[in-house]
């Protein structure tokens, strides 16, 4: 057979192979140019190697002129399993070249080099809980845009009908909260609290009435939601971020003061917490605030306070509950006049130089700064000036048990936006920094770190 006839036969065989709907084996037709159907596939194409990957010798011996390091078997396996993500990951994408365009763009050039690693590492940030073991202040994962609401939408709700839910898993959604708390009553809306779009492990749920709020707190505070123990509290509006009010507070002027009337309740059963105390005295009128004093172990001391807006409600409470028996304990209810700056349902204690309570607060916050070593004490700055002590407990007890929390005031009694918080254990302090550092509270990004005394 002449060279011309042999060349014609080779061309016919090549055309026949390319037109055939059945893929031929690579081991067939020794001596001919390699079938490049793999390189022509979308996603596996590399123009710079299109013609360089031909055989120099026997196809069976796998002798390449293009210098490819993988066997024919692996090339065939990559082609046959091109739609299997696990199979794709077995092969190093770097061998495809920098001009390979994947499903979401160039896989090597779209991301900075610092994000690429020679070894795969597990991302624990989506697991919720304590988050990853990386640097402090790590956020949860980004919440899907369609699941997140704007800040204005989140704060524009009826706070008296809302609850605050803490210690959520990072994969929880507003729909999960709605489904879970619908067992209590009709849910108007549910939101996940975020910081710059990142899940912070906290949320809010709004009901149609305040009775559902009380039931939700009694039934689900300390319950398990998505395999995590959650905290459920009465939701409070963020402290006012009004500039005029801030300036008034800077000058020591207290505007819109609303006088409340307080009763002291003694000999309470240990089973009565602040929510139960509030429920009891709500029968006498509009309760502004209720609290039960706890000892160092978090156990009730049997003493509590209830504040009313109307003096008539106070007299009604004394008349009804003084000498009243609860679980065998006879209550002792007396009046104690107290003036509070009350804004939107939250008590703000007025600092007074001769107050022994504020003297203790000064001693607790005196010479305390941030940037300390790991310990139970937390230093928080950049708080809204209208933040109350009760706000501190509402915020920081979403993480764990708080032994003490105090606001710092300047020499004139004006707020400084600084607070010192002591947790019961150092693990809660760790989580507090991780979850609440840079958290937007009342329009202010909080700066939280371990505290130290000078």
From Swiss-Prot:
Keyword line: Cytoplasm, Methylation, Nucleus, Phosphoprotein, Repeat, RNA-binding
InterPro entries given in the database record: Nucleotide-bd_a/b_plait_sf, RBD_domain_sf, RRM_dom, RRT5_SRSF_SR
Domain RRM: 161-237, 261-338, 376-453
GO cellular component terms listed in the entry, alphabetical order: cytoplasm; cytoplasmic stress granule; nucleus; P-body; ribonucleoprotein complex
UniProt source species: Saccharomyces cerevisiae (strain ATCC 204508 / S288c) (Baker's yeast)
Biased composition (Basic and acidic residues): 25-38, 50-113
UniProt superkingdom: Eukaryota
Recorded GO MF terms: chromatin binding; mRNA binding; RNA binding
Family annotation (SMART domains): RRM (SM00360)
Ranges where the record places region Disordered: 1-141
Post-translational events: Methylated by HMT1.
GO biological process: nuclear mRNA surveillance; poly(A)+ mRNA export from nucleus
Pfam families tied to this protein: RRM_1 (PF00076)
Biased composition (Basic residues): 14-24
Gene expressing this chain: HRB1
PTM annotation (Omega-N-methylarginine): residues: 127
Function: Binds to intron-containing transcripts and is involved in quality control for the export of spliced mRNAs from the nucleus. Binds to pre-mRNAs until splicing is completed or until faulty mRNAs are degraded. On correctly spliced mRNAs, GBP2 and HRB1 recruit MEX67 to allow nuclear export. On faulty mRNAs, GBP2 and HRB1 associate with the TRAMP complex that guides those pre-mRNAs to the exosome for degradation.
PTM-bearing positions, type Phosphoserine: 338, 343, 355
Consequence of gene loss (knockout): Sensitive to boron and hydrogen peroxide. Decreases cell population growth.
Subcellular localization(s) per the UniProt record: Cytoplasm; Nucleus; Cytoplasm, P-body; Cytoplasm, Stress granule
Descriptive protein name: Serine/arginine (SR)-type shuttling mRNA binding protein HRB1
Primary location group: cytoplasm
Cross-referenced PANTHER family: RNA RECOGNITION MOTIF RRM DOMAIN CONTAINING PROTEIN
């Amino acid at each position: 057979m002449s060279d011309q006839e042999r060349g014609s036969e080779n061309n016919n065989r090549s055309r026949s192979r390319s037109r055939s709907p059945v893929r031929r084996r690579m081991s067939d037709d020794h001596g001919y140019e390699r079938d490049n159907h793999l390189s022509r596939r979308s996603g596996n194409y590399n123009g710079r190697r299109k013609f360089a990957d031909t055989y120099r010798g026997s196809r069976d011996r796998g002798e390449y002129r293009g210098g490819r390091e993988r066997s024919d078997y692996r090339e065939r396996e990559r082609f046959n399993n091109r739609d299997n993500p696990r199979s794709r990951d077995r092969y190093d994408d770097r061998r495809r070249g920098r001009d390979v365009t994947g499903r979401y763009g160039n896989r090597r050039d779209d991301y900075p080099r610092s994000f690429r690693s020679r070894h795969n590492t597990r991302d624990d940030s989506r697991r919720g809980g304590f988050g990853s073991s990386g640097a402090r202040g790590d956020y949860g994962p980004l919440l899907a845009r369609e699941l997140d609401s704007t800040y204005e939408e989140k704060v524009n709700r009826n706070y008296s009908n809302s609850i605050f839910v803490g210690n959520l898993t990072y994969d929880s959604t507003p729909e999960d909260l709605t489904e879970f708390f619908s067992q209590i009553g009709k849910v108007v809306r549910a939101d996940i609290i975020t910081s710059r779009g990142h899940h912070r492990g906290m949320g809010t749920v709004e009901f149609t009435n305040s009775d559902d709020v009380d039931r939700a707190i009694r039934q689900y505070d300390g319950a398990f939601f998505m395999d995590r123990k959650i905290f459920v509290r009465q939701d409070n509006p963020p402290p006012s971020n009004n500039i005029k009010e801030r300036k008034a507070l800077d000058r020591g002027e207290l505007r819109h003061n609303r006088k409340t009337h307080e009763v002291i309740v003694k000999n309470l059963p240990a089973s009565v917490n602040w929510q139960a105390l509030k429920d009891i005295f709500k029968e006498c009128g509009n309760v502004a605030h209720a609290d039960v004093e706890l000892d160092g172990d978090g156990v009730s001391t049997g003493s509590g306070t209830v504040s009313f807006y109307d003096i008539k409600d106070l007299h009604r409470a004394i008349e009804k509950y003084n000498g009243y028996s609860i679980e065998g304990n006879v209550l002792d209810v007396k009046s104690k006049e107290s003036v509070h700056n009350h804004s939107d349902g939250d008590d703000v204690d007025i600092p007074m130089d001769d107050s022994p309570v504020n003297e203790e607060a000064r001693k607790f916050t005196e010479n305390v700064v941030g940037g300390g070593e790991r310990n139970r004490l937390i230093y928080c700055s950049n708080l809204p000036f209208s933040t109350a002590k009760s706000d501190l407990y509402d915020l920081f007890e979403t993480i764990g048990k708080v032994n003490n929390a105090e606001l710092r005031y300047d020499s004139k009694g004006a707020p400084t936006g600084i607070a010192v918080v002591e947790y019961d254990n150092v693990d809660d302090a760790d989580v507090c920094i991780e979850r609440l550092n840079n958290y937007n509270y009342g329009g202010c990004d909080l700066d939280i770190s371990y505290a130290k005394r000078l």
